Amino acid sequence: MKILILHQHFNTPETGGAIRSYYLAKALVDSGMKVVVITAHNEKKYKKEITEGIEVHYLSVAYNNRFGFVARSWSFLKYVKGVIRLAGQFKDFNYCYAISVPLTVGLAAQWIKSRYKIPYIFEVGDLWPDAPIQMEFVNNYFFSEALYLLEKSIYKSAHSVVALSPAIQSAIEKKVSGKKVHLIPNMADCEFYKPERKDPTLEERFQVQNKFVVSYIGAVGVANGLDYFLECANAARKAELPLHFFICGDGALVDRLKKNAQQLSLANLTFLDFTNRNGVQELLNVTDASFTCYKQVPILETGSPNKFFDGLAAGKLIVINFGGWIKNEIEENQCGIYCNPQQPTDFVKKITPFLHEQELLSRYQAASRHLAEKKYSRKQLSAEFAAIFSSPI
């Protein structure tokens, strides 16, 4: 079995960032399949590498989390063009697996299906174009309708669809009746991230001795709504709680958030540069609560953020400020707290019991790890993913 994976933002454990597509590719390789990934990088020349049995082709297509909507769109289309040029090398492959976002990767998958008769499976991590429309990046009615037509066309011509959350699965099933939609959420790497005692050396390096640590690890963009995270840090400062906050990542709003934090005199907040998963592991070692934050836009509640699953695997108290399926999950499993996004003082109210009751904190943290092992372990979901390709074409 030969599988061609299209993912513009493919990362490895060494490079850092979201590595779901690496996990998926590795699962297929471990199942005895040949796997080729077409991705992109910011270097000026095309490059080919073999990474743990995965053949990776890097197209020269610049992309940065700080890009605006137009620059991102141009990058997405340039990637599609590059895939089409390269795809002829793999015309004897059995399946194409196209990973969005962006939605436009579906154009490349459709072209490969039409030209080489290779069926494709389409992965949906965020509902496009709903997300950019609800966030008002796309305001033109006719452009919006064109994007919706493209979305439906991509789903309809796919062999099947993989959804990263129950909410996304439900939405696609409504949009394209009768289409097979698999549910393969993001994965908790329970072998790499584990509950562990805080390392005094790391506590000293991060300067958080005797502190309750709340960490946000991930993209720092408009969708992440991190103004609320700063408001929580400010509310904790005013309440004189022994908390320290971290924002670890990169994105369009980093500089503005740093400026705002300085204006608020948030000595209890530290910004850390984007890092690979070894760096994330070190930060999680000293972390008590893992914070997942979103701007208050309904469609964002359907997502499947990596940081949530890393926090579960590491056995951390989960803190969120949005509703939807993740809110239901943490409340049903008693492993996290939901904080009112309009009231930062609600965070102070709900986090305070965990500062004074170690048994309560330990119970919630253990429940996080249990949920990761029971429902979201990389081993379990990798097997479910590989099984998709054993079905007849």
Where are these regions (language model features)?
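Carbohydrate-associated surface elements
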Residues: 41, 167, 184-187
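Acidic anion/phosphate-binding donor-loop and adjacent secondary structure
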Residues: 188-204, 225, 391
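Nucleotide-sugar-dependent
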Residues: 224, 276-283, 288-313, 319-328
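Membrane-proximal helix-turn-helix segments that form the acceptor-binding/catalytic region
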Residues: 84, 104-107, 111-115, 141-163
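Nucleotide-activated donor-binding/catalytic signature segment of Leloir-type glycosyltransferases, i.e.
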Residues: 248, 255-281
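N-terminal subdomain of nucleotide-sugar transferases
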Residues: 1-60, 236
